[in-house]
Amino acid sequence: MQPRVLLVAALLALLASARALEEEDPSLLGLMQGYMQHATKTAQDTLTSVQESQVAQRARGWMTDSFSSLKDYCSTFKGKFTGFWDSASEAKPTPASDAF
């Protein structure tokens, strides 16, 4: 839903109110006002749910990107230290080779 829908609904409500006053039929005026209130509430609820959905999608995207970056950082960090530990264990003589 777009804000234009709310504007159209408000204009229709004003038009319906003006026409109902011309007709001098209070039941028609009440019926139209009730209908327009219901239509306005439905439009507002739909707009709110769309906005909440967009916010939820952005939050999920942000969390996914953050966890992906953290995972990449941990993999890089682990890779650097794994290479360090492997080279350190190869350079260090074992106690069995000192005995010979």
UniProtKB/Swiss-Prot annotation:
Q: Report a single Gene Ontology molecular function.
A: lipase inhibitor activity
Q: Where in the cell is it found?
A: Secreted
Residues listed as glycosylation sites in the UniProt record: T94
> In which tissues is this gene expressed?
Synthesized predominantly in liver and to a lesser degree in intestine.
Among its keywords, does the record have Glycoprotein?
A: yes
Highest taxon above the source species? Eukaryota
* Any Gene Ontology biological process: negative regulation of triglyceride catabolic process
> Where are the stretches annotated Lipid-binding?
68-99
Protein task: Component of triglyceride-rich very low density lipoproteins (VLDL) and high density lipoproteins (HDL) in plasma. Plays a multifaceted role in triglyceride homeostasis. Intracellularly, promotes hepatic very low density lipoprotein 1 (VLDL1) assembly and secretion; extracellularly, attenuates hydrolysis and clearance of triglyceride-rich lipoproteins (TRLs). Impairs the lipolysis of TRLs by inhibiting lipoprotein lipase and the hepatic uptake of TRLs by remnant receptors.
What is the protein named?
Apolipoprotein C-III
Natural source organism: Canis lupus familiaris (Dog)
